[in-house]
């Protein structure tokens, strides 16, 4: 007899469009509700809109587009304005930061890193504007600021790579270039210059939390899908009248590993696992070159690497 596994299949039930909170809200500030999308319904809610951008949202989108446009123009220039070459070599093009001799100067010529500085400015404005928008939207809805703080952890790693560490090292040349393969080359070279990042304990912690995040996400997703036949994905019903879904899910994990997370606790585990990926990763990058020149030598001094 066939079973309903609910791994790929999705039942889409459509009712009236949900406008969200409308009490004491000026609906003129929101976009109208768009159509329903079957494709979006495979991944989440099929309803499009309403969308609220606000001043920070508009600023972020504009700055993000300018960042994308600046890099795109440079790649187009590197391709000699040839569309065939542009498509062929897209992954090889790169917008590099200023050379070491320019230090932290903003006076580098456009073709020698000046354009990288301009692109980085737009990216800085775009990311921080979007973070501010995330914070203010949560505040407007009376929610906690958990999403904004989690986003801040990712911003921390990005800031360390592109701004904080280069400033501490005294040169924009320490920053990451904009490009596909050049980004990978920078990562490889960074590890070689600083004596193998595998001996950086914060790098190890970051990888451990990354694996942990993947494991927790898979465990949580699989558990809810496994009890969806009992209504386990219907959060309101599970709060008011749990039925058998929550109990079966909890019992499964007690049978499997001796204890189970709670409906709330699993999300606390998940957010900390995810946040610590970029938090510890940023610390590891920041210490490289500023505090520890060679992680292999550091490992030798601390009994983590062979002495010969």
From Swiss-Prot:
GO CC aspect terms: plasma membrane light-harvesting complex; plasma membrane-derived chromatophore membrane
Binding site for a ubiquinone: 253
Binding positions for Fe cation per the UniProt entry: 220, 235, 267
Positions with a binding annotation for (7R,8Z)-bacteriochlorophyll b: 183, 203
GO MF annotation list: bacteriochlorophyll binding; electron transporter, transferring electrons within the cyclic electron transport pathway of photosynthesis activity; metal ion binding
Keyword Magnesium: yes
Database matches in PROSITE patterns: REACTION_CENTER
Compartmental location: Cellular chromatophore membrane
Chief site of localization: membrane
Protein name: Reaction center protein M chain
Native organism: Cereibacter sphaeroides
